[in-house]
Amino acid sequence: MAITKEDVLEFISNLSVLELSELVKEFEEKFGVSAAPVMVAGGAVAGGAAEAAEEKTEFNLVLVDSGDKKINVIKVVRALTGLGLKEAKDAVEGTPSVLKEGISKDEAEAAKKELEEAGAKVELK
């Protein structure tokens, strides 16, 4: 009578952890393989992340410094974000602060230009 896959699985399921570990080591030695996860898949993910960074379509508008003209910057922040006076003032004084998240490149560039004209230092991330 031939041994079936079910027989092998039943036998393996009855092994202790130590016996199973030894069996895996014997498989590795006999067939020249490794039970370690393949790292190639991880490299492909990292490569995909690099491509995504090059083709970034959403940006975060970060106010780095308000500069000397804090009142002008607060006015622009209020106009861009719709925040109230106190919230805009807190955002300007609590730099670095994220003013907008997930905005398009065009919107981010326009907002950056407005803030820089008001005297602020801005980064797009």
UniProtKB/Swiss-Prot annotation:
Keyword Acetylation: no
Keywords: Ribonucleoprotein, Ribosomal protein
Top-level taxon of origin: Bacteria
InterPro entries reported for this sequence: Ribosomal_bL12, Ribosomal_bL12_C, Ribosomal_bL12_C/ClpS-like, Ribosomal_bL12_oligo, Ribosomal_bL12_oligo_N_sf
Cited Pfam families: Ribosomal_L12, Ribosomal_L12_N
Signal sequence residues: none
SUPFAM superfamilies documented for this protein: ClpS-like (SSF54736), Ribosomal protein L7/12, oligomerisation (N-terminal) domain (SSF48300)
BP GO terms, sorted: translation
GO MF annotations, alphabetized: mRNA binding; structural constituent of ribosome
GO cellular-component term (any): cytosolic large ribosomal subunit
Family assignment from sequence similarity: Belongs to the bacterial ribosomal protein bL12 family.
Role, per record: Forms part of the ribosomal stalk which helps the ribosome interact with GTP-bound translation factors. Is thus essential for accurate translation.
Subunit structure: Homodimer. Part of the ribosomal stalk of the 50S ribosomal subunit. Forms a multimeric L10(L12)X complex, where L10 forms an elongated spine to which 2 to 4 L12 dimers bind in a sequential fashion. Binds GTP-bound translation factors.
Protein's name according to its UniProt entry: Large ribosomal subunit protein bL12
Gene encoding the protein: rplL
